[in-house]
Amino acid sequence: MYFARRVMDVVIGMGASIVSDYPDQFDCPGHLAPLADYHLLSAAVESAKELGTPVRVGNILSEDAFYTDRPNSKDCFRKMGVLAVEMESGALYLNAARAGKRALCILTVSDQQFIRINSN
């Protein structure tokens, strides 16, 4: 994941942009916005405040291919304020919506894909 500032940052996905054909199975005309359940989201933010744990809340990118051959493929999402990239949240939110259930994706940043590390 990246776009958040540091490894170990906690990101709560309010919504999930999707680069995948996964949503097509639901046969919705247009593009459904996969969103977290508001009550779960607000409870998680309140719990983080009580624990003194800083969190960032916002849009995340759910993509089939975490690593690609296109080095600039995520630039648009970064410019649009996407906080992190992962592979499951979009499907989680869509499946929950279809099943009439509630869902929330809480992420911990595990790496920063675009930071170069000097090998010397």
Question: What are the language-model segments listed below?
Answer:
Residues 1-120:
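Glycine-rich phosphate- or other oxyanion-binding loops that anchor nucleotides, phosphorylated ligands
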